[in-house]
Amino acid sequence: MAQVLHVPAPFPGTPGQASPAAFPSKEPDPPYSVETPYGYRLDLDFLKYVDDIEKGHTLRRVAVQRRPRLGSLPRGPGSWWTSTESLCSDASGDSRHSAYSYCGRGFYPQYGALETRIGSNPRVERTLLDARRRLEDQAAAPSSGGLGSLTPSAAGSTSSLAGVGLLPPTPRSSGLSTPVAPSAGHLAHVREQMAGALRKLRQLEEQVKLIPVLQVKLSVLQEEKRQLTVQLKSQKFLGHPSGTRSRSELCLDLPEAPDDPAALETRSVGTWVRERDLGIPDGEAALVAKVAVLETQLKKALQELRAAQTQQVDLQPQAWPPPDTQVRVDTVRVVEGPREVEVAASTAAGALAQRAQSLEPYGTGLKALTTSGGPENTLVFRSHEVVETMCPLPTATTGNVHTAKKISITERSCTGAPRMTEPSSVNPRPAAASVVQPENPVPAAQDTTDKKPTRPAAASQDSQAADGAGRASLATKRKEDPADPEVNQRNLQFVGVNGGYESPSEDSSTAENSEHESTENEGPEPPARVLSPAECPQLRPPGAAVATTSLEGPQLSQESQRVPAPEVASGPDPEEEIRMDLSPDLISACLALEKYLENPNALTERELKVAYTTVLQEWLRLACRSDAHPELVRRHLVTFRAMSARLLDYVVNIADSNGNTALHYSVSHANFPVVRQLLDSGVCHVDKLNRAGYSPIMLTALATLKTQDDIETILQLFRLGNVNAKASQAGQTALMLAVSHGRVDVVRALLACEADVNIQDEDGSTALMCACEHGHKEITGLLLAVPSCDISLTDRDGSTALMVALDAGQSEIASMLYSRMNIKCSFAPMSDYESPASSSAEE
């Protein structure tokens, strides 16, 4: 076989120079070679081919140089292939499976020069001539199945000729493998297929080149779309289109509404719904009812004012007494009317100030208590009242107003049979009326007695309602439980009367302000002092009650004489200006809690939560503020006791989320009058700890004692509780806390209540060590004055009180402790063997 020779000479029309130096001089390749389209060289020399087969170097891939495109290759006479421009192009993908490309000498322009330079080879020339002749003969002879009948040569061209099968096998004896040329029709068909494939490949290459451009255009269009979307949204929010439009903006032609649009027809689709169906409370009706009640009360007050003015005009000026006399107006009135429902309270339990007190001046909200009891029979009672009213002096210069108290003695019959009493049967006496001293000296005053006849029951009830709702500010009512229904009952009632008008629906603060303003408008003098519950006269036993009214006058006279005159004539009492008005929500919540305390299954969880929250908020707002009024707290306590003893215990000891009760807050605010009222209730838990672990007794260390009453109050608190109780955090006692804060008065009170001075906290410290550490010399002296004080106790660090004082630099306290130690050592008791008697006996 001939050896394949690679010719590096460029094709015509391509840059570069062909040089013989491309062929090595030491190992020159044979001049005869055939190159395949993919750069493989086939050696035609048989011997060389056999040698390569043995060595395994039959096919070698060489670097393919770039050749010109189609049409650039010359068609020389030495080329038997008529379409060399298509078969020899390395850009064709279909030419990889084609047959051999036999290029003659005219294909390479320098082939002749190489042949002449290297030298002629007769063997190669004969092979070429033989191959040319065979090709011409085969082209002249018709061939029908050239492609199918040809088989590839087994001599080394299997890889390049297997797919085509152009060359028949050559006899091995000849030493040459000469391929047989295909037919012209087949070559033309192959050439057309390759040309079409090349065109298709070229189109695909052009389309591939357009892909980046199209991607760029697509990204540009997407960006424009995003900008247009943002611009469109901004125009929708602004409500008007922009004046300028960019070149790439999308123009949308939207139909515009006509200038004169047709009138749109509208209709209402609302539905009328009653508020009570929606669950909304009828506030308007409640306000209307409230206004009606206020108007009625105002009319009654105006009528009374007109009546008083008429009486003043009827009085003659010459009938007045001298200016030095006191003004006293006595009125005896017999009233008959239906019995009102009252809250019964026993006088056998509780302290003196807590027994059976009237709830009339506490507001109209207490009428809701009637719902908890059963139906009662309508009873008719008659009341004999001794009333002192206010009469302005008809002087030309000033008009002074005198405030008096109303003392009513009511005699009721439980049988329901009404009894009428004539006005003449009542013996009015001057001693039966309470004496009221004027607050300021009055220039001219006279004593008059006004006797009012018996009025109808309805009129008397209206008058009493006006008195109770408009002018009643404080009442103390004592009621005895009847042993027999036939036994008459007597109630003694003290009512402070003010001339002003108040609304029963107002709260305590509003009522207080309006009462004060009305008092100022009527006269320059403040109201008289109302007797406290302790100053009220004691009731007689029920067995000593007298059915007739003739003896009531002396009895009242004796009891009124027990009241000291200076107290009656003292200045204005702030208790008169306090008005308690229970809200309906608080009353309903208290009743609900009372039911729950009696029966835990009586309320649902939601109802219990609502009632508990309402009572907690109202009670904390009333009693836990720093400016809480003790009288208002006392009245609420009386109201709660009248409802139920369990309710009183529950409300007084109710705690907030931090575990603080009203007693905790009152002690912390140093509001000791409220503390006194809470302690007087008899149900206050004084040792209850909050979440921080402190009891009200421990919190007294933070309070400041201002008066002697405050000291007495904390003494009462200490006696009711455990003064040696420890806090849950550090184990400190009330004495340790008071010593640490330097409260000398509290320390004295605790020592007076026998507080233990030797109790140690979790660190082993005592109250004496706390005093030495903080440098409280006076408190140290108080602690050392206690005989049971042990100065030798040590803490966890092994330090005594003397060592603590020395470490803190308290030299004076250290000297006091040292002196106490020396005194103890000198007065220490001797043992038997050290006593003088034993020593003398031994001698």
Curated annotation (Swiss-Prot):
Give the matching InterPro entries.
Ankyrin_rpt (IPR002110), Ankyrin_rpt-contain_sf (IPR036770), KANK1-4 (IPR047184), KN_motif (IPR021939)
What is the tissue localization of expression for this protein?
A: Widely expressed with highest levels in liver and skeletal muscle.
Location of region: Disordered: 1-31, 161-182, 410-577
Modified residue annotations for Phosphothreonine: T170, T331
Write the record's keywords in alphabetical order, separated by commas: ANK repeat, Apoptosis, Coiled coil, Cytoplasm, Methylation, Mitochondrion, Phosphoprotein, Repeat, Transcription, Transcription regulation
Q: SUPFAM superfamilies, per this entry? A: Ankyrin repeat (SSF48403)
- Source organism superkingdom: Eukaryota
Q: Where is the composition biased (Low complexity)?
A: 457-470
Query: In the record, which positions carry Phosphoserine?
Result: S19, S83, S86, S89, S92, S358, S532
Residue ranges for the region (Interaction with AIFM1) are 1-72
Q: Where in the cell is it found?
A: Cytoplasm; Mitochondrion
Which GO BP terms apply?
apoptotic process; kidney epithelium development; negative regulation of actin filament polymerization; negative regulation of cell population proliferation; negative regulation of G1/S transition of mitotic cell cycle; negative regulation of intracellular estrogen receptor signaling pathway; negative regulation of programmed cell death; negative regulation of stress fiber assembly
The main location is cytoplasm
Q: Where is the composition biased (Polar residues)?
A: 547-561
Where are the residues of the annotated region Interaction with NCOA1? 661-827
Do you know which Pfam families this protein is assigned to?
Answer: Ank, Ank_2, KN_motif
Coiled-coil ranges (or none): 183-234, 282-313
Q: Would you name any one GO CC term?
A: cytoplasm
Q: Which residues carry this modification: Omega-N-methylarginine?
A: R105
Q: How does it assemble?
A: Interacts (non-phosphorylated form) with NCOA1; NCOA2 AND NCOA3. Interacts with AIFM1. Interacts with ARHGDIA; the interaction is direct and may regulate the interaction of ARHGDIA with RHOA, RAC1 and CDC42. Interacts (via ANK repeats 1-5) with KIF21A (via residues 1148-1169).
Q: What does this protein do?
A: Involved in transcription regulation by sequestering in the cytoplasm nuclear receptor coactivators such as NCOA1, NCOA2 and NCOA3. Involved in regulation of caspase-independent apoptosis by sequestering the proapoptotic factor AIFM1 in mitochondria. Pro-apoptotic stimuli can induce its proteasomal degradation allowing the translocation of AIFM1 to the nucleus to induce apoptosis. Involved in the negative control of vitamin D receptor signaling pathway. Involved in actin stress fibers formation through its interaction with ARHGDIA and the regulation of the Rho signaling pathway.
Protein name (record): KN motif and ankyrin repeat domain-containing protein 2
Q: What is the lineage of its organism?
A: Eukaryota, Metazoa, Chordata, Craniata, Vertebrata
